[in-house]
Amino acid sequence: MKITKVDVLHLKTNLKNGHWRPIVCRIYTDEGIYGDGEAALAYGESQIAAFGIVQNFAKLIIGMDPLQHEVIWDKLYRTTFWGQNGGPVIFAGISAIDIALWDIKGKY
């Protein structure tokens, strides 16, 4: 199985304060299975950063096997410029992808 596409969505909510806008990614496979994950930075300006990092990370996983989530996690952590320096935005991006991969694995 291979990852064919990743959509990154900046959702809107109907909340009165309008500050909560989740970042969700959907990973598609060549076998028709998809998985959803969320970057947990949905408040304030960090949501924009989370959206950007998930978009950047998404490009790196196209063609990879979604069932090898540890290999993908390691690639995002070790081979990206900011990965090993960590921080909430980086780990929110990795987590969104990792959650979507587990969703795929559960549906497989």
For each predicted feature, which ranges?
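Structured beta-strand/loop patches that form or line metal/cofactor-binding pockets in enzymes
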Residues: 1-42
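Metal- or metallocofactor-binding catalytic centers and their adjacent structured scaffolds
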Residues: 28-108
